[in-house]
């Protein structure tokens, strides 16, 4: 049994110093748990902060925006509006498609939201049109969330209809089954179909109308149960040739008889194998393609999901003909991997720099090894806690660990420095470890809990920003707590066994030179400190001026929300006049795409034209531009966007909107630009009056760029004004008119062809190639009640009007969204102020409400809570320090160091040209926890000297400053060098890390210079005030 030494010191470290085996095994357990946790942690770009979002898409080919709104969107919205936990509901009704996006509260599980949505769709089914070709389809993805992978499938030998069919049945379904895949959407889908193009003249010559033909086709192609015959010994299943499966089958179909002669479909129509929707198209670079956009499920390991898809691709490609080519054009995990790898390198660099600082100051290999062990042990042990808390390895958690590198070594340095001091005085290492650790234990606890207290307010931040930084704060707090445990257990134990008087006194040329250097620095600091202590009011003036300067700089500095990252992908929207046709839009888009591909920074692109669940109107096309890797291009993404937009001006009649794809997606709708501002009214008329006025005002605002809107009410409309009296006399109903028009111009899906693998549609339309434009309406024929064929022009007049291309709702009311980018050298805060001012100057009526959306709304919430967050951090730290010191005064002295850090951080941001965004705010909050360490170390030793050695406050604080100068300088440099790699980072995702590094470095430099002088002066001031208060005579007793 080990004999306990008589020295009763050691405090909480005593047991661990005296039991080295138990201490070592405890640390090994922490290390192993961390390694296992690291291997099991998922990898992502950022913490999981997605709002539970579900998109409901309903296709109704041929329907106008007004019909889609009233017949589909409105009934669905009424049902969705009754769901609990719904945060926001936005819808867009365009020609042939209704898209409703439902965003739920952060706390609501996505599976619960899914059940609510399914129930609401079921309730609305009876209210939807009976001829709806497809039921509403919902998907558990955010439409604004960019895909993790984009595949392009092309073929030089096969038609796109066959390629699409193979992609849908052999590729898309298999990929959808991969764990982590949320949705696979097919853009440019040319789904095979039989297209029946009626010849209007032939139909009229035979005395037929389109409704008769539609009914004949529908009745001729059926697929239903027929029963079976069950005899005494055998059972026979009944089957029939009731299915027509090819264009040849339909050509021979008899649709009517005239004078005993059969009228076949081929006599009055052209029947061909074609695409179900001829107004959809996609391209990979310049080649027609079927594009697969693969989106993730919320909360999955995006790296693992992408890897699983890539692993199965070779097998999927083998199932396709050799003439079909499959390429991965976009892989967002490439930049995620690169960004995480860069942060991991910066983490290792920070560790190396911190170890270097330790050696420079301690000048002793054993003394350097001890805190160097504490750093990786604390960081690796944190991974175990991250795993159990459900966190991931992402940019923010790795940034927290990088910053923690400078924090976790502080405690070990303070312990080693104090123990070494006693060893150098001649005490035995074990006694020195017990005495030094016991003396410094309270300081370590004070430093740790006061620093963790600063992070507590981050845990209570609300909404998306709070969820975003929760992992950052908890990861950092866990690393700090583990470092405190290591510093109070392993560090003193190693000191007792690795340090000795001889090893500490042993010097080489470097250590001797550095010792002389530090002695001179401390001596010079002592002289300056005496001068400052003898002129306290000047120092107090400097301290007070830093507070005023902090407030002034906060008011002046540009403010933003989240750094714009260069992820190598640009999302583009090409907008043409509202009356543009599909073919003309496709031609314009391909011209622009060809020029984009000539840019030296562009590697590839995909483009799409048509109306689907993402693209709302025919006059807008989507582009996804993939840039070359950052190492292969000289420019960052803002410069490339500027150049591409300037290039697009050579194409008249189109406008190109570009925005970089970001890891953080808060919006719920695909937008042309980065930020959105919504107007909501009770009627479309109010919006049609005020949206153009506000748009004109904002387009003249210098703080804004690329101002546009989804308000489009200048689409051409051919209004069929039916004389109801005349129609009634002829026995023609409005239903007959609508059916005739739908049959002719709606790409109407009139029948279904069933196969073993898929289902295909029969599409009915008029062949308008011979009579384009409004003249085609003259070919419409209807059947009167007595069987006479009546031209449409007999009972109706055609009027050309303007109408909406889409109808947008927000929470069931008409809305319009104005999208914008921030111009030039302006900040998001300045842009928001400019919009608010323009709205005020325009004096909008009270029944029009306005609201920022997405990232801009989150920015306003974050900005409004910044001061409260900082105040909460200060109050939390004051409470912790007050409890630890049992004093109201000493915490104030410690907190007096904070303005110096604020000044340094804000000045550094302004000098670097950075905005005060949420990343920088986190840096400032961390500085609050760091810079007070200097004051704690000074005040702890000053109070101990007053209490134990009977020193005066002046002598006590002077001695404390000199004794703690070296560990203060060492810990500050360690924290500074831990943040330096973040400030100097240039790789992928550097934009995210840069503000944090700039804040930390700037704040630490400024606070280190000032607090070494202001803290002792303020300590003496408050000590004097406290003594004067205690010396006041007691109140005399009343007689």
UniProtKB/Swiss-Prot annotation:
The keyword Cell inner membrane applies. The chain crosses the membrane at residues 16-36, 342-362, 373-393, 396-416, 440-460, 472-492, 537-557, 863-883, 888-908, 911-931, 968-988, 1002-1022. GO terms for cellular component: plasma membrane. InterPro entries: AcrB_DN_DC_subdom, Acrflvin-R, Multidrug-R_MdtB. The keyword Transmembrane applies. It is a multi-pass membrane protein. Keywords: Cell inner membrane, Cell membrane, Membrane, Transmembrane, Transmembrane helix, Transport. It is found in: Cell inner membrane. Gene3D superfamilies: Multidrug efflux transporter AcrB pore domain, Multidrug efflux transporter AcrB pore domain like, Multidrug efflux transporter AcrB TolC docking domain, DN and DC subdomains, Multidrug efflux transporter AcrB transmembrane domain. Pfam families: ACR_tran. GO terms for molecular function: xenobiotic transmembrane transporter activity. Part of a tripartite efflux system composed of MdtA, MdtB and MdtC. MdtB forms a heteromultimer with MdtC. Belongs to the resistance-nodulation-cell division (RND) (TC 2.A.6) family. MdtB subfamily. HAMAP family: MdtB (MF_01423). This is Multidrug resistance protein MdtB. It comes from Serratia proteamaculans (strain 568).
């Amino acid at each position: 049994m080990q004999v306990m030494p008589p020295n009763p010191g050691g405090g909480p470290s005593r047991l661990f110093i005296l039991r080295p085996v138990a201490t070592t095994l405890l640390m090994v357990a922490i290390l192993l748990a961390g390694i296992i946790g690291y291997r099991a942690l998922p990898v992502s770009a950022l913490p999981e902060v997605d709002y539970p979002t579900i998109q409901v898409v309903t296709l109704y080919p041929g329907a106008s925006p007004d019909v889609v709104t009233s017949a589909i969107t409105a009934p669905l919205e009424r049902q969705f509006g009754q769901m609990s936990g719904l945060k926001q509901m936005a819808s867009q009704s365009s020609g042939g498609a209704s898209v409703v996006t439902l965003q739920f509260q952060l706390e609501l599980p996505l599976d619960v939201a899914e059940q609510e949505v399914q129930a609401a769709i079921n309730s609305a089914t009876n209210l939807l049109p009976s001829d709806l070709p497809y039921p509403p389809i919902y998907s558990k993805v955010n439409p604004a969330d960019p895909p993790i992978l984009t595949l392009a499938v092309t073929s030089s030998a096969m038609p796109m209809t066959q390629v699409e069919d193979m992609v849908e049945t052999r590729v898309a379904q298999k990929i959808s089954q991969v764990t982590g895949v949320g949705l696979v959407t097919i853009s440019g889908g040319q789904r095979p179909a039989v297209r029946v193009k009626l010849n209007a003249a032939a139909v009229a010559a035979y005395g037929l109308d389109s409704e008769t033909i539609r009914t004949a086709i529908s009745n001729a192609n059926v697929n239903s149960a027929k029963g079976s015959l069950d005899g005494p010994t055998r059972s026979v299943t009944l089957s029939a040739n009731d299915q027509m499966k090819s264009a040849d089958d339909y050509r021979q179909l008899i649709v009517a008889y005239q004078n005993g002669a059969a009228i076949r479909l081929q006599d009055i129509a052209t029947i061909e194998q074609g695409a179900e929707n001829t107004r959809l198209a996609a391209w990979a670079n310049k080649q027609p393609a079927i594009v697969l956009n693969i989106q993730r499920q919320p909360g999955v390991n995006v790296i693992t999901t992408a890897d699983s898809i890539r692993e199965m691709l070779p097998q999927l490609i083998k199932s396709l003909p050799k003439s079909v080519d499959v390429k991965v054009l976009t892989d967002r995990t490439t930049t995620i991997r690169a960004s995480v790898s860069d942060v991991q390198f910066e983490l290792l660099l920070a560790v190396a720099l911190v170890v270097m600082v330790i050696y420079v100051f301690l000048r002793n290999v054993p003394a350097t090894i001890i805190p160097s062990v504490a750093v990786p042990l604390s960081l690796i042990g944190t991974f175990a806690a991250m795993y159990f808390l459900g966190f991931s390895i992402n940019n923010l958690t790795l940034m927290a660990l990088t910053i923690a590198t400078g924090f976790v070594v502080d405690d070990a340095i303070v312990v080693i420095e104090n123990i070494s001091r006693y060893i150098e005085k001649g005490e035995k290492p074990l006694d020195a470890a017990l005495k030094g650790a016991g003396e410094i234990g309270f300081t370590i606890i004070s430093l740790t809990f006061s620093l963790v207290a600063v992070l507590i307010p981050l845990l209570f931040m609300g909404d998306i920003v709070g969820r975003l930084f929760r992992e950052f704060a908890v990861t950092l707090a866990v690393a700090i707590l583990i470092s405190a445990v290591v510093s109070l257990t392993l560090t003193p134990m190693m000191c007792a066994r690795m340090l000795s008087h001889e090893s500490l006194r042993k010097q080489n040329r470097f250590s001797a030179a550095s010792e002389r250097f530090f002695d001179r620095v401390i001596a010079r600091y002592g002289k300056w400190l005496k001068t400052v202590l003898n002129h306290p009011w000047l120092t107090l003036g400097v301290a007070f001026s830093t507070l005023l300067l902090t407030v002034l700089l906060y008011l002046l500095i540009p403010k933003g929300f989240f750094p714009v990252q260069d992820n190598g992908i640009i999302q583009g929207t090409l907008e043409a006049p509202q009356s543009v046709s599909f073919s003309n839009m496709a031609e314009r888009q391909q011209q622009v795409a060809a020029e984009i591909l000539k840019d030296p920074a562009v590697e590839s692109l995909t483009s799409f034209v048509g109306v689907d669940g993402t693209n709302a109107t025919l006059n807008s096309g989507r582009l996804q531009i993939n840039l070359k890797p950052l190492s292969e291009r000289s420019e960052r993404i803002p410069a490339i966007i500027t150049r591409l937009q300037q290039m697009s001006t050579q194409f008249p009649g189109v406008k190109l909107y570009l925005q970089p794809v970001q890891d953080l997606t808060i919006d719920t709708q695909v937008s042309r630009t980065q930020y959105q501002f919504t107007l909501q009214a009770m009627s479309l008329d109010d919006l049609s009056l005020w949206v153009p006025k506000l748009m004109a005002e904002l387009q003249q605002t210098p703080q804004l760029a690329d101002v546009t809107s989804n308000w489009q009410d200048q689409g051409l409309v051919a209004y069929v004004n039916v004389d109801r009296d005349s129609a009634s006399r002829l026995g023609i109903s409005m239903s007959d008119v609508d059916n005739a028009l739908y049959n002719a111009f709606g790409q109407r899906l009139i029948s279904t062809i069933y196969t073993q693998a898929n289902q295909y549609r029969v599409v009915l339309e008029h062949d308008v190639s011979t009579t384009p434009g409004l003249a085609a309406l003259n070919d419409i024929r209807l059947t009167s009640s007595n069987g006479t064929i009546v031209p449409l022009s007999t009972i109706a007049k055609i009027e050309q009007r303007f109408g909406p291309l889409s109808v947008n709702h927000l929470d069931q009311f008409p809305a319009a969204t104005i999208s914008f980018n921030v111009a030039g050298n302006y900040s998001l805060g300045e842009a928001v102020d400019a919009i608010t001012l323009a709205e005020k100057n325009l004096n909008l009526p009270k029944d029009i409400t306005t609201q920022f959306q997405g990232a801009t709304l989150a920015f306003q919430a974050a900005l409004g809570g910044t001061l409260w967050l900082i105040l909460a951090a200060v109050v939390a730290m004051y409470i912790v320090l007050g409890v630890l010191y049992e004093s109201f005064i000493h915490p104030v002295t410690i907190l007096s160091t904070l303005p110096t850090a604020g000044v340094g951080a804000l000045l550094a941001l302004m000098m670097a040209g950075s905005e005060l965004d949420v990343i920088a705010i986190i840096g400032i909050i961390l500085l609050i926890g760091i810079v007070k360490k200097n004051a704690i170390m000074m005040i702890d030793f000053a109070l101990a000297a007053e209490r134990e050695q009977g020193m005066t406050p002046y002598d006590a604080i002077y001695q404390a400053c000199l004794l703690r100068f070296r560990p203060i300088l060492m810990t500050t440099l360690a924290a500074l060098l831990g943040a330096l790699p973040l400030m100097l980072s240039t790789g992928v995702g550097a934009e995210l890390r840069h503000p944090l590094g700039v804040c930390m470095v700037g704040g630490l430099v400024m606070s280190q210079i000032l607090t070494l002088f202001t803290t002792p002066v303020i300590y003496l001031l408050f000590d004097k005030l406290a003594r004067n208060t205690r010396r006041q005579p007691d109140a005399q007793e009343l007689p």
